[in-house]
């Protein structure tokens, strides 16, 4: 048996002591990971629920597992959702993470822009307006790429600069110009 043989000599005793130390270190980190995962998943769940309540036009309940998998259900415990609701849940997940980063001491004072490409295409008008109203709370700078004119949806107070990508379909060449250049 390994324990009897290793206990018989000094080198074996040292090896056994090192193994015990490493097992204690392993247990510490396993416990820390479990505790932190549980705490962060609860915080994320609260953040996502708040954002969903603000952005969705229907009531949904959020649960976040320790592995950060999100489950969103209605009052019948049904998970099915429209493409628009799925998009809003995605926004809420991103927003929930960004809120956690803002609250984390290691990230305070640092600014990260949020870049969204065509984010409103699946949303109905009410959901779109609710999401637009929440976006400025996600990050200090939000960059939105859209093929649609959003001036009727986003207030001028929340628009810094507008750039237009002007493409020439025949030559597949594009240039970027400042300003709203579409009609």
What positions do the PLM features span?
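Extended, charged coiled-coil "arm/hinge" scaffolds of SMC/Rad50-like chromosome-maintenance ATPases
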Residues: 1-71, 102-107
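Conserved ABC ATPase signature
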Residues: 37-41, 70-98, 119-125
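Hydrophobic, well-ordered secondary-structure elements that form the walls
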Residues: 52, 89, 117, 142
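Eukaryotic, compositionally biased intrinsically disordered regions
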Residues: 59, 67-69, 120-123, 133, ...
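Conserved catalytic network of the ASCE P-loop NTPase/AAA+ motor domain
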Residues: 81, 104-108, 134-138
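C-terminal lobe/lid and adjacent interdomain/linker elements of RecA-like ASCE P-loop ATPase modules
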Residues: 126-183
């Amino acid at each position: 048996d390994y324990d009897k043989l290793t206990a018989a000599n000094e080198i074996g005793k040292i090896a056994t002591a090192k193994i015990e130390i490493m097992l204690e270190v392993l247990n510490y980190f396993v416990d820390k990971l479990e505790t932190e995962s549980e705490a962060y998943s609860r915080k994320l769940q609260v953040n996502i629920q708040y954002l969903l309540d603000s952005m969705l036009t229907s009531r949904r309940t959020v649960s976040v597992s320790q592995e950060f998998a999100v489950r969103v259900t209605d009052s019948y415990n049904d998970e099915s959702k429209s493409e628009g609701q799925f998009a809003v849940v995605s926004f809420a997940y991103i927003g929930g993470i960004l809120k956690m980063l803002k609250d984390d001491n290691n990230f305070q004072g640092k600014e990260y822009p949020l870049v969204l490409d065509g984010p409103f295409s699946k949303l109905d008008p009410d959901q779109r307006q609710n999401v637009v109203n929440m976006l400025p709370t996600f990050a200090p700078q939000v960059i939105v790429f859209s093929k649609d004119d959003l001036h009727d949806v986003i207030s001028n107070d929340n628009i810094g600069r507008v750039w237009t990508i002007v493409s020439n379909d025949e030559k597949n060449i594009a240039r970027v110009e400042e300003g709203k250049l579409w009609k």
